[in-house]
């Protein structure tokens, strides 16, 4: 494994030497010596990796080599960047720069000679230890080849989670009965060891038709080991009242009071997933009233937690799979599309498969991991290698003993070991994040790009390929929400995260700092070896000034409840080799981002999302290698953005502040590599800057009075790759009617469109992009019913009308309209009184949300014809609505076929 990481580092170093050969002239002799030693080193790596398991000495050799490769890359890249920066004009500046250049060249030559000598010494030690040269004639797949293979694999992998459901049908039925038919038990607990399928079982119960009909509202909160009282209460309230914008501003007392009153008055189901200790319940129990009506489904590895929460708790013990069920689940993963008519699996492979699943201890997680491991192996010899590996390195046993846990861990580890090097690197990056984190896939893709895992292709595409492969192998769980208005996230199962942490420690990949006063880190024994930091405590920022952190390449601060403050202006002085810096939600003393940020010339990734920053320094112009820059800071006053972004020509992702001061003028025309641009303002930039951004796939733009829709539209004509276009709300756009200027039919790739601009009438359907899938209309002020036009957009799958998008009183969805629509949301349309849905309209509709439309008299009668409808959310409507639509109500016939009907805040 270490050999793979060293080889990966060497490959990047060779690429750097080749790419910058012209700028490295003058130190050719030193570079030739370095290259000779690197070739010798490369030939020793295979044998070294084969012998590392039996020798600490060999492991140390490999760690030394990895450090040397990193050091060489840092030295060479620093030299190139310093040579590129500060092209001064005038004789004096030229002379001064020439002197600095000669000094730098002398220093880099000396440094390279030092690295070469150290490599030579390590090679000598390795050879004296008996490590042999192995010339590897193979080659790794190129990025394009890997993507092609992944596309082929992906075609044969199931899109549905139904493959997980083996042996749980009776358990689901039993649990549903206890929740909807039995009033004796306030709390129902699912208990069992990690990986046994508690969460999968709870999720099936949570979404069951009978459960959805029985309760008025639902909340699902993952508690996990690290949580705060306030965070759990916020999450429950957000689930029960998703459109309440005041929740995040409430203190603990206000949260407790509101939740208590809500649960006391209604019939709600609350799922607390992954509660570890009895004491955890004591921290959060104050919001749950004694009055019955609400119920709780709780999952825990500790049976005592449920009984501690409620002495009358019904404890359901999740059971392991028997051998037949284990093999059935494994088959579903390995052969997702096979049916009974197809040729049977080779008898020898089937026999090996059934033997291998016995080592999984009946745990679904381990079975799925094994299935993912076998899914891309199609021959008897390939299966035999996996079979031998499992059989020789683990010992089977009963599912309760330590041998079985070791067996399960080994199964999960094998899935990791089977990954190609680039995916190992991707996987270990997930160790940065705390347990149960929802990890933004967008951020993750750019982390990977900043690490140099891929380049040359669109970053989002490459990231999607790699993430899908990790999901396919059951190493990562993806949020498969087809509503693209919502952020995409991925997560890790607890046990898989333990594997990730263990491997990260083994490879000295990462140091996690939880408390600077103790050694609770992944790599406490040798912190100087780790070049990545993840800070999980606001108290730990002071360690960034330590000299042993000077080689750190990545610093990520995941979001926690506590505040993170950076108070020192010199905080970045010792971090000059950083490639990744994520300071989202961090607060800066005086609101100033330190000028020392300009010294981080190696940065590829910088996020200040929701950071408390009111001043950005002009020294940011030095960050010429940035691929990702997020400046959506948390500031009440408009912020000044210096006109230095134009020099960051490598940028692929740029998110600008929503409030910029009048003095901000940004020249962005040279950012031709951008794929994602949020917050582009025609007040602060010229619309012609967009003409050259032909790689853009996502654009969110704010219009000003001096730029009309027609002008903008003509500037966007060259953006043929644009997939998402959002027009952001501003007071200026609300004062102008853009109806006559709307023309977007030339955007043939556009899938998502958001319009927060005033239009008295919806444009004709021929003016919309021809393949539009998702449409969001807000603050449009339309006076005519938009439905006759929208229902003719044949590819639409989701429509959302919000906050006075429509000012009329009557809407009609006619027969045959919206042939592919799956989701519709009508929110805060204060003038809407009547909505008619004709039979034959919206035949594919699955989810309908009506929120705070106070004048709407009743639910459309035509909903009774939409048999595809699975979920109906009624929120913020009058009590009469709920009384009419519950069983026995006069309008119940309209919704009796809908499995999941939710009433949220409908008690007024």
UniProtKB/Swiss-Prot annotation:
Changing residue 387 to S: In strain: cv. Di-17 and cv. Landsberg erecta. Changing residue 752 to E: In strain: cv. Di-17 and cv. Landsberg erecta. Changing residue 528 to R: In strain: cv. Di-17. LRR repeats lie at residues 575-600, 601-623, 648-673, 693-718, 722-746, 748-770, 793-820, 842-867, 882-905. GO terms for cellular component: plasma membrane; plastid. Changing residue 537 to R: In strain: cv. Di-17. Keywords: ATP-binding, Cell membrane, Coiled coil, Hypersensitive response, Leucine-rich repeat, Membrane, Nucleotide-binding, Plant defense, Repeat. Changing residue 369 to V: In strain: cv. Di-17 and cv. Landsberg erecta. Changing residue 429 to F: In strain: cv. Di-17 and cv. Landsberg erecta. Changing residue 29 to E: In strain: cv. Di-17. Changing residue 257 to P: In strain: cv. Di-17. ATP binds at residues 192-199. Changing residue 100 to R: In strain: cv. Landsberg erecta. Residues 15-57 form a coiled coil. Gene3D superfamilies: 1.20.5.4130, Helical domain of apoptotic protease-activating factors, P-loop containing nucleotide triphosphate hydrolases, Ribonuclease Inhibitor, Winged helix-like DNA-binding domain superfamily/Winged helix DNA-binding domain. InterPro entries: Apaf_helical, LRR_dom_sf, LRR_R13L4/SHOC2-like, NB-ARC, P-loop_NTPase, RX-like_CC, Rx_N, WH-like_DNA-bd_sf. It is found in: Cell membrane. Changing residue 518 to S: In strain: cv. Di-17 and cv. Landsberg erecta. The LRR repeats probably act as specificity determinant of pathogen recognition. In cv. Columbia and cv. Landsberg erecta, RPP8 specifically recognizes the Emco5 avirulence protein from Hyaloperonospora parasitica, while it is not the case in cv. Di-17, where it confers resistance to Turnip Crinkle Virus upon recognition of the viral capsid protein. Disease resistance protein. Resistance proteins guard the plant against pathogens that contain an appropriate avirulence protein via an indirect interaction with this avirulence protein. That triggers a defense system including the hypersensitive response, which restricts the pathogen growth. The interaction with TIP (TCV-interacting protein) may be essential for the recognition of the avirulence proteins, and the triggering of the defense response. Triggers resistance to turnip crinkle virus (TCV) via a SAG101-dependent pathway. Belongs to the disease resistance NB-LRR family. RPP8/HRT subfamily. Interacts with the NAC protein TIP. Interacts with MORC1/CRT1. Interacts with COP1 and is subsequently degraded in a 26s proteasome dependent manner. This is Disease resistance protein RPP8. It comes from Arabidopsis thaliana (Mouse-ear cress).
